């Protein structure tokens, strides 16, 4: 499935990536190949496979929590489209009660 350049530009915009024309072409090729693989996977007959299957016998294997330094504020906000007073600025989604 060959994606259009507009498709790739749209995905890049959603991911907030600035890609050069060469990078856009490379991503178009890569993403098209990935979608081709998904199309092949969709053709596999899985009717005999139970809807939920655990193949590793692992149950909730999690690492111990450990305190580590956090990301510096400047780095965290570097790609934010809008920021205010050192915080992410997002559009309000709730209406205020009257």
From Swiss-Prot:
Catalysed reactions listed for this entry: L-glutamyl-tRNA(Gln) + L-glutamine + ATP + H2O = L-glutaminyl-tRNA(Gln) + L-glutamate + ADP + phosphate + H(+); L-aspartyl-tRNA(Asn) + L-glutamine + ATP + H2O = L-asparaginyl-tRNA(Asn) + L-glutamate + ADP + phosphate + 2 H(+)
An example Gene Ontology biological process: translation
Recorded GO MF terms: asparaginyl-tRNA synthase (glutamine-hydrolyzing) activity; ATP binding; glutaminyl-tRNA synthase (glutamine-hydrolyzing) activity
Protein's name in the database: Aspartyl/glutamyl-tRNA(Asn/Gln) amidotransferase subunit C
Record keywords, A-Z: ATP-binding, Ligase, Nucleotide-binding, Protein biosynthesis
Signal sequence extent: none
EC class of the enzyme, as a word: ligase
Enzyme Commission number, as recorded: 6.3.5.-
Stored Pfam families: GatC
Assembly and binders: Heterotrimer of A, B and C subunits.
Similarity annotation: Belongs to the GatC family.
The protein's role, per its UniProt record: Allows the formation of correctly charged Asn-tRNA(Asn) or Gln-tRNA(Gln) through the transamidation of misacylated Asp-tRNA(Asn) or Glu-tRNA(Gln) in organisms which lack either or both of asparaginyl-tRNA or glutaminyl-tRNA synthetases. The reaction takes place in the presence of glutamine and ATP through an activated phospho-Asp-tRNA(Asn) or phospho-Glu-tRNA(Gln).
């Amino acid at each position: 499935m060959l994606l259009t350049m507009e498709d790739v530009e749209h995905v890049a915009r959603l991911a907030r990536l600035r890609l050069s024309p060469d990078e856009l072409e490379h991503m178009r090729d890569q993403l098209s190949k990935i979608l081709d693989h998904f199309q092949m996977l969709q053709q596999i007959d899985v009717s005999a496979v139970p809807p939920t299957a655990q193949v590793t016998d692992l149950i909730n294997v999690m690492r111990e929590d450990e305190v580590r330094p956090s990301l510096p504020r400047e780095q965290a906000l570097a790609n934010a489209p809008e920021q205010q007073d050192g915080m992410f600025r997002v559009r309000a989604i709730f209406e205020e009660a009257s």
